[in-house]
Every structure is written in C-alpha cells, then in structure tokens.
C-alpha cells in the first residue's frame, strides 16, 4: 500500500479505536457488506478514489448507496474512509476490509478477560488453515467459482466445530469474498491482525538487572494502571542497559535505560 494510502488507513484506524470497546459483530457484518458494494463497481471505486473530488463529495456518494441499509455508526465509519485520499481503488477496498476485520477482532477481545478472546480467535483461524492445507479436496471446493458463497461458508463452518462467533464471521468472509486471494491467505491476514491486537495486552520489559518479586509486582501494577488494562508482563535482563528499564506494549516503546539516556546526551553534544 502506497504512502498516501498507508497514512489514510492509519488515520482511520486511529479514529476507530474509540468505537472498538463497544464493537459488535453486527457492525463488522455491515462494514463487510459495504465492502461488497464497493467491490461490485469499478466505476464507484474510481469515483471514491478520484483525487480531484472533494472528500465530502466522495463521502456523500458512498452514503447515498448505503444509507438505510447499515447503521448510522457504520455509515459514519465508511464516510471517514471515503473522505481520505487513496493511491489506488484497490487500496480503499483493502482499508475497508481491514477496518471491518478490526471491528470483528475487537468483539473477540471484549468477550473475554485479558487476551483470552484473542487467543481463542487466533487458534480457531489457525485450525481452519491447517485443516484446509491438509485437504486438497477442501481447497478445490473453497476455490470453486461455480459454488455459492453460502455453500462455501457452510463447508468452512464444518471444518472448525466449536469456533467462536467472530472466527466464523471472519472465515465466512474469507471464503465468500476472498477478493482475488486464496481464502486461507485472507484468513492468515486476519490472524495477523488479531496477533497485532493481542500485543496490546503484552508488556515486554527489559531491565539492566534482575528484579525481586516485590519490584516485579510494583512494575506490573504500575503498567496496568498506566495502560488501563491487566497486562501480561514478560521481563528479561540485559546488562548492557546498565540501569533503568525499556518497555514495549504493542507498537509503543518507552526507553528509560541509562544507555539510551547516554545516547541521547551524545547526540545532543554532537549537535
């Protein structure tokens, strides 16, 4: 995805965070249904990614096609997507697919404490892909162009008995509308999104010397308070840090190590 599209997707995903704590599977389904509308018309995709059109005009166009068919919340999300700039028509669809999948993944995240819901989701997606990989007949059935989406979804559901609601939703989307990819490849992409989401629940802490139990407990409590959720804290020792601590939670890194502060000082002196 080109730089301008990547920036637009990042902006929309950042705005989406406020919705995710109360996300529903129905919202994800609605967003996937809008994706089907966008994918159904090359002319619509060109209009929505035309750099000469105002963002509000593009949003109005898409809204006119989905209003009354999806919730106001879904319409607001796709409006935000349509207003952004996209390097290609494909990029808009890919971003909408990512947004819909992220909403679904958030449902799994909200259903169980900590990262349990995400772990269950990842496992269900993994089991599906392993089952498909081991059976060429299933692979052919899922890629058969004459088979209906409903038939493919029914087969996919039978491959992972006991799968979560969200896993069934994402797997069903992958087999019904793979958008030019192999269904298993799209499921793998969804699993990667879930894994990235799960990293928000893991704090990787590096310290210069080993901590005692009391220090570990205080560190965990402080991180949980800082991030507002119960994190799984993994602590490792790296003597080269000399002192201080380095913390990674998801994409965020806080480096308060002595070696980092010395490096900053050297850069300031060199400047």
From Swiss-Prot:
GO terms for cellular component: plasma membrane; proton-transporting ATP synthase complex. GO terms for molecular function: proton-transporting ATP synthase activity, rotational mechanism. It is found in: Cell membrane. Belongs to the ATPase delta chain family. It comes from Renibacterium salmoninarum (strain ATCC 33209 / DSM 20767 / JCM 11484 / NBRC 15589 / NCIMB 2235). HAMAP family: ATP_synth_delta_bact (MF_01416). This is ATP synthase subunit delta. The keyword Transmembrane does not apply. F-type ATPases have 2 components, F(1) - the catalytic core - and F(0) - the membrane proton channel. F(1) has five subunits: alpha(3), beta(3), gamma(1), delta(1), epsilon(1). F(0) has three main subunits: a(1), b(2) and c(10-14). The alpha and beta chains form an alternating ring which encloses part of the gamma chain. F(1) is attached to F(0) by a central stalk formed by the gamma and epsilon chains, while a peripheral stalk is formed by the delta and b chains. It is a peripheral membrane protein. Keywords: ATP synthesis, Cell membrane, CF(1), Hydrogen ion transport, Ion transport, Membrane, Transport. NCBIfam families: ATP_synt_delta, PRK13430.1. F(1)F(0) ATP synthase produces ATP from ADP in the presence of a proton or sodium gradient. F-type ATPases consist of two structural domains, F(1) containing the extramembraneous catalytic core and F(0) containing the membrane proton channel, linked together by a central stalk and a peripheral stalk. During catalysis, ATP synthesis in the catalytic domain of F(1) is coupled via a rotary mechanism of the central stalk subunits to proton translocation. Pfam families: OSCP.
